[in-house]
């Protein structure tokens, strides 16, 4: 019988990051700030917000499909904050379900990141899922900077913020 030590740990970690990610995303007035960029080389706020909402779905693709091709990866067309939140919640459910249904043997299998069919790199799924959770945290942090620059209050994430003293 295959163990679920890694899958359980990754699922618990993902579940820890989701509430604060949700609190950030639900504060974004996407319709108003979609095209905001703090610098000419920065991502637009709409793209960054969608990226944060989509990252959990990557976990499901890693487990179930064993590859992601960023050239052909389908991105949702999101125009409203309501659509964004529905998309995020759906992606979280898919990630959680995939982790619940996987076992540690599954996570030892190889994941491939591709660009237009060309393999960019491969590694065990457990490594890339862990990196993907880090990626979510990184871009959520980036999003909080965009929020601050637009006068949007920053929620408590790992502790109180200047705007939210709850913990």
Spans of model-derived segments:
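Extreme N-terminal tail/first-helix region
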Residues: 1-15
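Helix-adjacent hinge/juxtasegments
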Residues: 61-103
């Amino acid at each position: 019988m295959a163990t679920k030590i890694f899958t359980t740990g990754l699922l618990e970690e993902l579940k820890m990051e989701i509430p604060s990610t949700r609190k950030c995303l639900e504060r974004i007035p996407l319709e108003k700030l979609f095209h905001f960029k703090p610098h000419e080389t920065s991502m637009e706020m709409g793209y960054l917000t969608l990226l944060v909402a989509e990252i959990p779905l990557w976990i499901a693709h890693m487990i179930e499909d064993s590859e992601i091709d960023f050239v052909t990866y389908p991105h949702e067309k999101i125009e409203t904050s309501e659509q964004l939140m529905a998309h995020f919640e759906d992606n979280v459910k898919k990630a959680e379900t995939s982790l619940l249904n996987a076992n540690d043997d599954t996570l030892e299998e190889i994941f491939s990141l591709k660009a237009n069919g060309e393999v960019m790199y491969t590694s065990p799924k457990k490594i890339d899922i862990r990196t993907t959770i880090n990626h979510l945290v990184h871009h959520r942090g980036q999003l909080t900077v965009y929020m601050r620059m637009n006068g949007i209050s920053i929620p408590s994430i790992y502790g109180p913020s200047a705007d939210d003293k709850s913990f």
